[in-house]
């Protein structure tokens, strides 16, 4: 029997889950070659600007396979609508039947993306962070910071954005959560003061120049998830002591790594995959003076893992489907 759950039911069980454990295990399985993930399906729109990603796959010898559809329409804030929406379909790997429809409205995608940022910071952030820099004022610009709490002891933020109204709203909302927030429209102000920087925008041209990066800086770049998007000067990756990809194969054609590769600034063999760092097959940050970059383009194994965890928690909690 197919069960259908809405976002409110999904949120009821999230507090019971160790999502970080599931996501880390997924990345490790992926880097070990135990995950089947076809190329990302996508639709890109111009007027209004937006994109839809279709990500799907399975872990070998697991119980399920998943298909996720997630949309992002970045000007929806102008018409008082969420900038993202979506759902995940979970099927049995044994007989192909649809077991669960998770009407999460992109909530699970946002959670698994924020958790990936937490995992990256755990292995790659400098030991002392006085201020966090954030590029982007919407969902991931907020969630990335909130999900860092278990691994980063810092409550000061400098946030960059294009629209002052959005910056003001971000400042007001995050200060209610206990953060100290400074807003800016000058990227250099962020890079000057922050050694941990998160980029979470749909930009299609670099926001940060290589000359602005200070020794000891870590950047988690997660906004560039299509071949059109770009947030970093490719020379930043050339200068970095360590460049980590959530999926090397996927980052060959999308994200910041693809731009640096196309420019001949880095080589594929210089890249490290996140799952190998988690598993201890590769080292994370080894010095507070290193410049490190993580390119998170979003991998289907994250969707598989979080959908599986939520589905099983909902069954165990005996929450009825809608």
Regions found by a protein language model. Give the residues of each.
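N-terminal Rossmann-fold NAD(P) dinucleotide-binding loop
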Residues: 141-142
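Conserved beta-strand elements of the Class I
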Residues: 132-133, 292
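N-terminal ligand-binding/catalytic initiation module
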Residues: 1-110, 116-118, 125-128, 301-304, ...
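NAD(P)-binding Rossmann-fold cofactor-contacting core
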Residues: 150-177
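Rossmann-like adenosine-cofactor binding region
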Residues: 179-260, 265
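Short helix-loop-beta connector
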Residues: 124-131, 153, 214-215
